[in-house]
């Protein structure tokens, strides 16, 4: 079936919103099961067929994105991804303070902006009633019916002044474009509504001639419409296939963009842990296509898409109400999913420093050459104006740089490491690299993983690269790579709930990365062999990447025989052949010793190679 037809009929939403309201159900359990059997991405638990109520059914399914919505809840759901929000008042965004109502910003179309109220003003009274200290009751004084008026007393620079303002309906768009720092095009997007792609395009066209870099702020953006995210991406990258969806049957669909790019400039993309779903699809696609420098913390990790059944496509079941269910996993332009793992920023920095670092790497075309520092990382040249960048911002940048980063002064010839550049500039910072890796042939891979928070040492900076790895430990390593939430559901008799690795083992088992020994036990304290680890890693690669998953189905008998001839057990041959074909083994296939204990440094190197090959860690 044509993808556009599917999406038109069912409305695929990429949202991280969950409605937790008490609902009167009109849909029957039998009808819900029919819809789940038809479209649900995962296999339904056997217990689902014993459910007597919808509430019980959805609890058994255990998917926060699969649920029933009453008519009121459905309307609220649809409103949550609209391109605009309407509020009634004088057109200000505010903060309550002990000194009055602080005007954080004035809104376009509001009477406050037209009358000359400014950000930073304090509203101390409304119609003569004091707003000091400010609270909800103070706010109630300035809102009211459209067309009515209110006189606000404003304190500015020690002087008071009165403004008589009309209360109006003010429309707040979910996407706004402006120019900051005199040369950066800034797009702030809180969600992807139906026309957000058009808003991106219009904003870029409006100011592109006067900027040399774009900054797209997706912090707190929980998602929206898939096609809108693709259209927004297309405004930067132009035509092509930018997103893939795969259903439970393995059928693949795609989203394409068919216009030229509206800008030649690269975008710096701000993200945080609340950046989810469609916004992750945007960020991941920009990363894969070489047009997005992602800055911030690792994103939420919602790489699944939902469809909505309502009266438009199932009139026999619904009358104003609806049911949303997970139907697809989505993959970025390069074939990687962000489901669970999230999008890993090129520059992983704290939320507190993310915006400052993002603006810093946008450079400054007016700076003197002597004040510029260049960072080469992940295929990008990041230009930093040292004269405008605070020392703590530089420290946050240096902490985020992996071993592959190269730095130099714009008018200099010497290429430096982050440590050397920081020393030259007199900036102190806390490196994330591990102290005992210098003699390891895999030092760069280990320290890259450490930079991105994927491996940890012992808390004192040591990794012990030459030591072996236990089965419980590898679950923690893979769990951190995937950004898994630990699970309390006990899967093995010998993994007690109180063990430090228990949550990781349970989570890895639920995802199918690890299996027990067939006797109900996992043997978490046993040393892991090379073939055991590579089997686990091959499952991870298949989960993360379309390319690895398809390659696994294409492995020939000749490849399996070659692995067996090297000493791999039959259950390990496919995994070894897959990783060998993907060129992600820590050593040539013929040099491996399948039954030997794998070393921590070897495990880290192959993990880095997989994350790099699938595009999640492109450094």
Task: Tell what function each PLM region has.
Residues 27-82, 151, 156-158:
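Interdomain regulatory linker/hinge segments that flank or connect interaction modules
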Residues 32, 53, 92, 112, ...:
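Terminal peptide-recognition signature
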Residues 15-19, 23:
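Hydrophobic core
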Residues 122-153, 201, 228, 302-313, ...:
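PDZ domains, with a preference for the canonical peptide-binding region formed by the helix
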Residues 179-215, 219-430:
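C-terminal "post-core" interaction segments
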Residues 27, 83-133, 194:
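PDZ/PDZ-like domain segments forming the peptide/carboxylate-binding groove
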Residues 410-619:
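N-terminal propeptides
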Residues 101-102, 124, 137-177, 326-327:
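PDZ-domain C-terminal substructure recognizer with occasional recognition of PDZ-binding tails
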């Amino acid at each position: 079936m044509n993808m556009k037809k599917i999406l038109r009929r069912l409305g695929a939403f990429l949202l991280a919103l969950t409605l937790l309201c008490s609902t009167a159900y009109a849909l029957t359990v039998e009808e819900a099961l029919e819809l789940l059997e038809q479209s649900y991405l995962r296999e339904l638990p056997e217990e689902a067929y014993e459910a007597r109520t919808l509430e019980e059914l959805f609890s058994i399914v255990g998917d926060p994105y699969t649920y029933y919505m009453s008519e009121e809840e459905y309307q609220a759901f649809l409103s949550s991804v609209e391109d605009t929000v309407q509020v009634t008042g004088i057109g200000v965004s505010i903060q309550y303070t002990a000194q009055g109502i602080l005007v954080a910003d004035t809104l376009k179309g509001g009477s406050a902006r037209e009358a000359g109220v400014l950000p930073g003003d304090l509203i101390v009274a409304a119609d003569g009633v004091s707003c000091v200290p400010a609270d909800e009751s103070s706010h109630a004084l300035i809102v009211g019916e459209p067309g009515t008026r209110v006189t606000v007393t404003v304190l500015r620079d020690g002087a008071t002044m009165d403004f008589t303002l009309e209360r109006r309906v003010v429309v707040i768009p979910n996407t706004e474009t402006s120019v900051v720092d005199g040369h950066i095009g800034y797009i702030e997007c809180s969600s992807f509504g139906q026309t957000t792609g058009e808003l991106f395009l219009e904003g870029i066209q409006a100011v592109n001639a006067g900027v040399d870099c774009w900054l797209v702020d997706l912090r707190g953006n929980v998602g929206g419409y898939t096609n809108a995210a693709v259209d927004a991406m297309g405004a930067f990258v132009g035509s092509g296939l930018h997103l893939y969806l795969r259903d439970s049957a393995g059928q693949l669909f795609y989203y394409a963009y068919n216009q030229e790019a509206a800008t030649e400039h690269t975008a710096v993309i701000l993200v945080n842990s609340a950046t989810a779903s469609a916004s992750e699809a945007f960020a991941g696609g920009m990363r894969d296509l070489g047009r997005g420098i992602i800055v911030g913390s690792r994103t939420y990790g919602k790489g699944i898409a939902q469809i909505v059944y309502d009266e438009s496509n199932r009139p026999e079941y619904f009358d104003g109400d609806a049911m949303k269910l997970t139907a697809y996993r989505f993959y970025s332009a390069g074939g990687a999913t962000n489901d669970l793992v999230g999008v890993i920023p090129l520059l992983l920095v704290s939320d507190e420093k993310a915006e400052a670092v993002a603006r810093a790497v946008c450079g400054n075309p007016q700076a003197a050459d002597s004040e510029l520092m260049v960072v080469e990382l992940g295929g990008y040249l990041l230009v930093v104006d040292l004269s405008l960048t605070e020392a703590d911002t530089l420290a946050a940048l240096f902490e985020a740089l992996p071993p592959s980063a190269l730095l130099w002064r714009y008018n200099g010839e010497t290429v430096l490491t982050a440590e050397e550049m920081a020393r030259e500039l007199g900036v102190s910072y806390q490196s994330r690299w591990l102290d005992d890796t210098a003699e390891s042939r895999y030092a760069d891979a280990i320290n890259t993983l450490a930079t991105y928070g994927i491996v940890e040492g012992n808390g004192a900076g040591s990794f012990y690269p030459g030591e072996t790895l236990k089965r419980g430990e590898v679950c923690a390593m893979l769990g951190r790579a995937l950004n898994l939430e630990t699970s309390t559901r006990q899967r093995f008799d010998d993994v007690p709930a109180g063990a430090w690795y228990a949550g990781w083992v349970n989570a890895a088992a639920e995802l199918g990365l690890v299996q027990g020994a067939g006797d109900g036990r996992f043997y978490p304290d046993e040393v892991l062999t090379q073939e055991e680890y590579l089997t686990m890693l091959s499952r991870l690669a298949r989960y993360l990447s379309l390319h690895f998953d398809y390659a696994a189905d294409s492995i020939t008998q000749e490849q399996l025989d070659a692995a067996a001839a090297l000493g791999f057990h039959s259950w390990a041959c496919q995994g070894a052949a897959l990783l060998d074909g993907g060129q992600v083994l820590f050593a040539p296939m013929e040099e491996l010793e399948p039954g030997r204990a794998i070393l921590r440094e070897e495990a880290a190197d192959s993990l880095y190679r997989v994350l790099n090959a699938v595009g999640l860690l492109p450094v």
